[in-house]
Amino acid sequence: MVKILGVKYFLHDSGVFYIDTKNKEIFGILTERVTRIKHDGGTVIPILNEYPKLKNIDYVAYPFEQTNLDFILFKHIDDYIKRTYKPKYIKEYAKYKKELSQNKTKFVLNNIYRPFIWEILAVYGLRKLLFKRFNNIYNKLGNLAIKRELKKIFRKDVSLYEHHLCHAASAYYFSPFFPKETLVFTLDGIGDWKYHSLWLFKEYDYRLVSYSSFDIICYDDVEGIFKGASIGHIYSLFTEILGFTPNSDEGKTEALAAYGKPNGELYNLLKKGYKINKEKLRWEHDINILKKLHNKQYLQKWKEKIGDENFAATIQRWLEDTVVEYLNIVYEKFKIQRLAMAGGVVANVIMNLNIFERTPFEELYIFPAMGDDGVAAGAAILKAVELGEDISWLKDLEMPYWGPNYSREDVEKELKKDKWKDKITYEYIGEKWPEIAAEMIAKGNIIAVYQGKMEFGPRALGNRSILADPRDPKTRDKINSTVKRRPWFQPFCPSVLEEERERLFEKSYKHKHMAIAFRMKKEFWDKLPSAMHIDGTARPQFVEEKDNPNYYRLLKKFKEITGYGIVINTSFNLHGRTIVRTPEDAITDFIDCNIDAMFIEGYLVKRKI
């Protein structure tokens, strides 16, 4: 019986995942929720300062086998930005990081007397040479660096696990399929020099079936990075060319794609660049074509030629088609009905819809924290399996309410602080809040809900949510423009009573995590216009009473009033900020955005006029 901490630290989405096998307890949180810098990849020390219990562990597990020396560059630049500029949110952080990347001399000169600067100078000078000629040395030195860093923090030896295996383990052991034989598919940008893997899991045994390599295309002297073949990276590159933030705004590319049509010539280039080897079950690459496709000037010309919407539609359609083609080949080989999935690309809900509709798999599971936010969970699980621990109980934890919670007393203490007295009013309404909230939504109000444990993963599922009426066609534009302050074309997702699923949607299944889209029946398009995208799809959370009793009551009351057990549900945060964690976060974001009321652990909060 042991306590294990999975730790993701480096590049983006750092965080921890705690498993206590004796008490059957888990806890997961990302660094971004503490620092409020979205996709924060820095040290997990801010988490440990907030939750010191996480230091009381037996083992530490890390979700990479190969962490190269770039870790040193990232760590010190990240520390420097946070120490020097103290950025509040991701926009400020990204601004300073861009400045430093364009002026490395400034960074070096400002830190010349600090002991770590000699590490920086050594890596800057040797990274290209080491990487090209002595890649193994570059990776081994990186592994030593990350182990040294984590051992300094936790005073424990660190176990390293292959990145895609960590994705796969999280998807299988939290799925309802355990202990049955299951195919597990992962797809992301890069992890341990792969971007895709296919596994066979059965109980505590697993084997790697195939993987696709991150084949090096070229070295970018301007950005100081190696570019490689990767389905996730090419999608992120299209996202960047569209003017969005790569590794963050891919959902915007996906949303914009619904307004365009794929360009045949560009689509065919992508198809020729990434070819499926049917025997080896992997993607292989035409490097000459990929050199073109990874040239930003070349892609910029394509975008200008065909327009933003068609540019987005091309990469989206190609993604859907190539993944569906691959998985159909996999199914024909194995004839296994169960498919579990994880990896950053698996956040693409329209791709997942295509897998559901266009492949023969009968059972599909997508891990709620499908991106690198979830690999800490996979690493902790793999350590438990290695130690022979029973983790069969994980599959019973359907809803990812695995983060911190704050009591009514904590909330009351925060509400009473002097800094809020001129900004908000509040009253305690107790357990009747779900019904009052439903009544307010039905009258056209936009409300926020803060209750219970915070969600683990990118989706708010009723505990840190902003809710609104899907019947009003103006709801989406209102939230986009005055509440979330996002682009006009981004859709919002609905939370739906499970008993309403077959009434409102075409072919679907009991999915609870907003990780796949389904098609709304056409007779409801004009009745629930803000619950779906322009193409008639919606990314729903189907809610049962056992999942979240208070949220279920809210939906039931809304159906009683309106005839529809469905509300718009978007995460409780402003655009560019992270989902709120503490009562202080909740009050701050409530004041800063145009929400009519907030329900927080039995309190009804409103802004002073």
From Swiss-Prot:
It comes from the Archaea. InterPro entries: ATPase_NBD, Carbam_trans_C, Carbam_trans_C_sf, Carbtransf_dom, NodU/CmcH_Carbamoyltrnsfr. GO terms for biological process: biosynthetic process. Pfam families: Carbam_trans_C, Carbam_trans_N. CDD domains: ASKHA_NBD_MJ1051-like_N (cd24100). Coiled coil: none annotated. One of its GO terms (molecular function) is transferase activity. Keywords: Transferase. Belongs to the NodU/CmcH family. This is Uncharacterized protein MJ1058. It comes from Methanocaldococcus jannaschii (strain ATCC 43067 / DSM 2661 / JAL-1 / JCM 10045 / NBRC 100440) (Methanococcus jannaschii).
